[in-house]
């Protein structure tokens, strides 16, 4: 099948690799190179780099909402468009430009976690099951019909990186199965109940509320690493918690109280045992290394 591919980050790479192997990728659309590192050198997106290596024509428009781009897409000899974490809204004229429309890989149990941050919200909300869906896109926000779906259980303390990699690889496999059977698949309309929205994360969400349960805070730590990171302030400095574990233990302490010299912290319910931290502008350290340089005393009440 002849394919136009639209995507940008690492999450989209396994799918493009599979398409290059099994189909004919006629063109790739991705975000423009961005300044990176101290030298602010322009860096191609992971999808741009992969397409470049395979000599596939690459386009980096600043929007899809203009006639020039729509005409360009109409001229590309393709049967279908695949869109994965591209970063731009796809207008109706492009959604309907090819025989089989536009397909999308969405890493959640739709209609749960529609929107920009389904992986993060899955972990933050403490979900124990999830799915990867192949969806035919329409003009709504992740409201299209489901062509193929695979459910799976989540390990209790799965990290964002682990879930990202699992869904990226599973989505790539499902995409190839979908394309192989596309003429025989009966699309399934998403149910109207159970709809939630996975809104984009904000930096403010990362600030710890010690009145929440240790379990909830641990979910946030795993779901918000690396960005925005979960943090507290101590001596007017921001300290991120990169790794922790929660203990379902009863206590009588005020929420936010450091109850041991190993940085165990009383929460609204349960105790958070911190394992890895990073002070602003410094490197990440395990708890032993961190406490050698920053002594947070027992009985301190953190804010």
UniProtKB/Swiss-Prot annotation:
Report the top EC class in one word: transferase
Enzyme Commission no:
2.1.2.9
Which keywords does this Swiss-Prot/TrEMBL entry list?
A: Protein biosynthesis, Transferase
Q: Name one Pfam family in it.
A: Formyl_trans_N
Q: Which reaction(s) are listed as its catalytic activity? A: L-methionyl-tRNA(fMet) + (6R)-10-formyltetrahydrofolate = N-formyl-L-methionyl-tRNA(fMet) + (6S)-5,6,7,8-tetrahydrofolate + H(+)
- InterPro entries, alphabetized: Fmt (IPR005794), Formyl_trans_C (IPR005793), Formyl_transf_N (IPR002376), Formyl_transf_N_sf (IPR036477), Formyl_transferase-like_C_sf (IPR011034), Met-tRNA-FMT_C (IPR044135), Met-tRNA-FMT_N (IPR041711)
Look up the domain of life of the source: Bacteria
SS bond list: none
> What is the documented function of this protein?
Attaches a formyl group to the free amino group of methionyl-tRNA(fMet). The formyl group appears to play a dual role in the initiator identity of N-formylmethionyl-tRNA by promoting its recognition by IF2 and preventing the misappropriation of this tRNA by the elongation apparatus.
Q: What is this protein called?
A: Methionyl-tRNA formyltransferase
């Amino acid at each position: 099948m002849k394919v136009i591919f639209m995507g940008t980050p690492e999450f989209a790479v396994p799918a493009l690799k599979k398409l290059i192997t099994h189909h004919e990728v006629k063109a790739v659309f991705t975000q423009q190179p961005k300044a990176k590192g101290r030298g602010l050198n322009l860096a191609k997106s992971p999808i741009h780099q992969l397409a470049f290596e395979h000599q596939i024509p690459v386009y980096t428009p600043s929007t899809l909402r203009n006639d020039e781009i729509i005409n360009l897409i109409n001229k590309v000899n393709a049967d279908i468009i695949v869109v994965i974490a591209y970063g731009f809204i796809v207008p109706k004229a492009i959604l309907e430009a090819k025989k089989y429309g536009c397909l999308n890989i969405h890493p959640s149990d739709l209609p749960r976690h529609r929107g920009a941050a389904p992986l993060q919200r899955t972990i933050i909300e403490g979900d124990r099951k999830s799915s990867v869906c192949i969806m035919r896109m329409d003009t709504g926000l992740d409201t299209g019909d489901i062509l193929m779906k695979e459910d799976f259980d989540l390990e209790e303390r799965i990290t964002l990186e682990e879930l990202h990699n699992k869904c990226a690889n599973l989505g790539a496999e499902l995409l190839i199965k979908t394309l192989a059977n596309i003429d025989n698949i009966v699309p399934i309309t998403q149910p109207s109940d159970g709809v939630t929205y996975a809104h984009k994360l904000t930096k403010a969400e990362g600030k710890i509320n010690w009145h929440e349960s240790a379990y909830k805070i641990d979910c946030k730590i795993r779901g918000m690493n690396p960005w925005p990171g979960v943090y507290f302030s101590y001596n007017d400095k921001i300290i991120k918690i990169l790794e922790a574990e929660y203990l379902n233990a009863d206590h009588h302490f005020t929420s936010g109280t450091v109850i041991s010299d190993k940085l165990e912290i009383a929460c609204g319910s349960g105790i958070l045992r911190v394992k890895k931290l990073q002070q602003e502008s410094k490197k990440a350290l395990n708890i032993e290394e961190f406490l050698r340089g920053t002594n947070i005393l027992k009985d301190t009440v953190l804010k």
